Amino acid sequence: MGGALGPALLLTSLLGAWARLGAGQGEQAVTVAVVFGSSGPLQTQARTRLTSQNFLDLPLEIQPLTVGVNNTNPSSILTQICGLLGAARVHGIVFEDNVDTEAVAQLLDFVSSQTHVPILSISGGSAVVLTPKEPGSAFLQLGVSLEQQLQVLFKVLEEYDWSAFAVITSLHPGHALFLEGVRAVADASYLSWRLLDVLTLELGPGGPRARTQRLLRQVDAPVLVAYCSREEAEVLFAEAAQAGLVGPGHVWLVPNLALGSTDAPPAAFPVGLISVVTESWRLSLRQKVRDGVAILALGAHSYRRQYGTLPAPAGDCRSHPGPVSPAREAFYRHLLNVTWEGRDFSFSPGGYLVRPTMVVIALNRHRLWEMVGRWDHGVLYMKYPVWPRYSTSLQPVVDSRHLTVATLEERPFVIVESPDPGTGGCVPNTVPCRRQSNHTFSSGDLTPYTKLCCKGFCIDILKKLAKVVKFSYDLYLVTNGKHGKRVRGVWNGMIGEVYYKRADMAIGSLTINEERSEIIDFSVPFVETGISVMVSRSNGTVSPSAFLEPYSPAVWVMMFVMCLTVVAITVFMFEYFSPVSYNQNLTKGKKPGGPSFTIGKSVWLLWALVFNNSVPIENPRGTTSKIMVLVWAFFAVIFLASYTANLAAFMIQEQYIDTVSGLSDKKFQRPQDQYPPFRFGTVPNGSTERNIRSNYRDMHTHMVKFNQRSVEDALTSLKMGKLDAFIYDAAVLNYMAGKDEGCKLVTIGSGKVFATTGYGIAMQKDSHWKRAIDLALLQLLGDGETQKLETVWLSGICQNEKNEVMSSKLDIDNMAGVFYMLLVAMGLALLVFAWEHLVYWKLRHSVPNSSQLDFLLAFSRGIYSCFNGVQSLPSPARPPSPDLTADSAQANVLKMLQAARDMVNTADVSSSLDRATRTIENWGNNRRVPAPTASGPRSSTPGPPGQPSPSGWGPPGGGRTPLARRAPQPPARPATCGPPLPDVSRPSCRHASDARWPVRVGHQGPHVSASERRALPERSLLPAHCHYSSFPRAERSGRPYLPLFPEPPEPDDLPLLGPEQLARREAMLRAAWARGPRPRHASLPSSVAEAFTRSNPLPARCTGHACACPCPQSRPSCRHLAQAQSLRLPSYPEACVEGVPAGVATWQPRQHVCLHAHTRLPFCWGTVCRHPPPCTSHSPWLIGTWEPPAHRVRTLGLGTGYRDSGVLEEVSREACGTQGFPRSCTWRRVSSLESEV
């Protein structure tokens, strides 16, 4: 009863004070009720000193009302609060919510939802239980929510790379929400968090202690996160200490719910306990109350500036609850955005601060709470160490599961970066590391160490070892930046940190050597390394003789002095002695039209093949020479391709690289002998310098003045030319060369390593961690994890294989195979040359002339055709019309022939024109001049062109002698005209004079001796109409000089026919000629008679001349002209000499063109006579040559044309002139215009 009177009397006094204020003053004041959740000394002192004089700096007058609630009975609390709201016009309530007042906070939240009165909690004790708050409640909290606390706790775990942890909770309200928040944060993070275990224990009074002990002993996590109340936390830590989970080897993190008051932590709390509180955790109760009242006052002031009046006081609890009035809703919105004394008090719709400032605190060794981190605007700033693991002298506490690791920055093994400026943390794949600051540590200084982020090859190895061996670690950078060296008896660097037990382990680019192994223990090497040398590329210039650099001088001499000359002489000698080429007429080699393949042309041919030039050359004809030329062409392809492939490497701007063979190279051992002196150095206080100092003292003495402070400085010196070579660990140099911008730095020998060793992890002497670390490293090596890490960290875009492609000359050894090929080809050519002569001079005469060996003849002809080709007879079909638009002699002759064909309808002339046209077209396409048949006479008394002579028309021969018109003689005997065949010429049977000539008869027939031929006059020839040829032999082309109808070789232009097919062939050719077109004479133009008029017309039949003889075996078969004799078409030479008649406008006189065009007519056409003509009766040496040739006991049929390849010398025209020939020879074929082209 007495307990209930106290609050009633207090309420009565408050109401009396409110009544005495007066109406006028109360309209401008804001009434704020301050409710204390306990009645301790601090609360009592604050209540007595809390007056309106404490809030004079606020924009509105404040009337504070203090209420103490120390009764946990909900009904009494509701009665007290509702009485206050009903008696006084209260604008808001400030509530001091400790961790023991969760029930009062819940009741106030209910009252706010009914009366819409703003309630502001200032201590944060009710933050956990009011998640979420009641609908319509205006309860605001200066504390942080459980979700915000979890975010900071996970940031602490991330800061120290504590990815594996366990969660232990009690049955306190909110534990399910806590577990849900842990899983949500772990799943949303990019880090691979590992929740090892989750335990829910009954930690209240009378709970099962044995079960709690058993479950705690099963936990195997170095980091534990707990959720419970203050009283439950005392029980939990007491049980955990008995289970061995409390100590330096374990880390505990709890939210502020488990702390309660931070004034006096319980004795069961372990040293190093980490928690998260608000930034007001060190503020006094009076300061907290002042902040709460200021938020309400500033919200009311903002409301009055907008609406001109203060917001209405809160309603009564007895009134019927209804919707929130617009004025109360507007006042609540003004309270959500308030700034006071530079701090942002913006609240979320849930009633919590949007951007709270939190503090990470830890229990130190003096049993005091110490701030070790700060969370501000999403960034965590931590102090190292996070818990007091060090004494005042920074000596570490012995810990069986936590290691202090020292390292040294050196790319790519340890790379140090600054934290993310936006979040203040480290990005993924990095580990927080620290570097000790130079200033003295003080309690107010939060940064005795500089926070950094470390990554790299060694950092990844450390993270994998921590997971496998299961340990936690602190990572810090050594202050002197050295690996470790003994200076005046004191070790520095990472070796000194481990040796003096300031660190449990050291990892980095730490080389294992004998001196270090005496004082510390090393693990198995995880990276193979040694000593290597790095140099820089320097730009050079292209030498003027760079185009000669692909081959050595010996190769050039061998190529052009020896090979080219020897092969050229070889080809010429083979061609010279070849039985089918040069050897056929050595005495005529220098005459016009004869063989002209000389040694100069042989050299020119081989030179053109070497450089693949399109120049005019003359190819050899011998088979052996052609084989040699083909082999030389293959040699030239290889030679030129090798030269071209290597030329680019020498023609570009060469880059000079200092090449050294090793540490024993003369450039290192005698650097002063170089000009300028060779400059090289290393980073001191390392294993590289120790190795050089121990083995090469003179070298070490020279390099001391060129030593560099760090690897980066050395690389800069190399690029700037201050250093010629840098000696250091091979693994580091290979990485730097691969990552160098521009790929200017290279390691010699593609990363050649000297004094091979490895990198290891340094541990204290006789450390119990050594065996576990070694086994873990061997497992990583066996699984290929280290190879994967090397691929990620130790490889670069500039590979040494590409950087050190150095050009070298091709020596004799490189080109020996090509020269060997030439030697073998020359040997094989000699064998082919000997076999060719053996077959030509010996074996071919031993083959019997038998019809059973016809297949050998066919086989021989086939092989011969493959190498030399056989001129095939053109088809009897009409060839395509030639191009008559060209301004050339050939085009003019073709035009003339076509015009002649259109003017006449004589079948014989028409067919002759057809054959001439096709022959000219064939020779024009093949670009080949047919060989002549026989020599033609020259006129002894030449006259002017176009003038008639007594002898009639002369033959179209005689070189430069123009044709002379002679008087025709009456015909004596008609000659049989054979069927005209295309591309084949035949002579008419002639009579010879009765003159006798001395003859030398051989085994193949009568021949004229050389002396007798020389005795003949130059113009001593048979009559022109008795010869087969139209020009002298001296002007023929250089074809072989063979007798008439040579035997045994078969003529080139004769196709092989059996004896039974000769007559069939002749009939078939006659039929083909008969089917040719024959224009009628009616279509003849009237100007033809004037163009081709002669004084002595020819008889209307195809006849020979006076010496023509009728063959007994053949009847004369002559064809008559279809038109009058006055319109007779003249012969080809007559047409050329006659001139242009009047009335023919298109006729262009080109006398010199015609004369030169018919000087090399190689064929004659006529019936083959089996008896000599009458004119040969006086020349018995011609009888043997007049017989038709017999091929393999076969006599060729009639009407066959042959090439005149006899050995007749020039005979004067007067020899047969005595017989008196009535008329000149009729020329039926124009064979060649090659001289004109």
Swiss-Prot record:
Residues 930-941 have a biased composition (Low complexity). Changing M815V: Increased NMDA glutamate receptor activity characterized by increased glutamate and glycine potency. One of its GO terms (biological process) is synaptic transmission, glutamatergic. Residues 601-620 are annotated as: Pore-forming. Disulfide bonds join C82-C317, C426-C453, C433-C454, C743-C798. Component of N-methyl-D-aspartate (NMDA) receptors (NMDARs) that function as heterotetrameric, ligand-gated cation channels with high calcium permeability and voltage-dependent block by Mg(2+). Participates in synaptic plasticity for learning and memory formation by contributing to the slow phase of excitatory postsynaptic current and long-term synaptic potentiation. Channel activation requires binding of the neurotransmitter L-glutamate to the GluN2 subunit, glycine or D-serine binding to the GluN1 subunit, plus membrane depolarization to eliminate channel inhibition by Mg(2+). This is Glutamate receptor ionotropic, NMDA 2C. It comes from Rattus norvegicus.
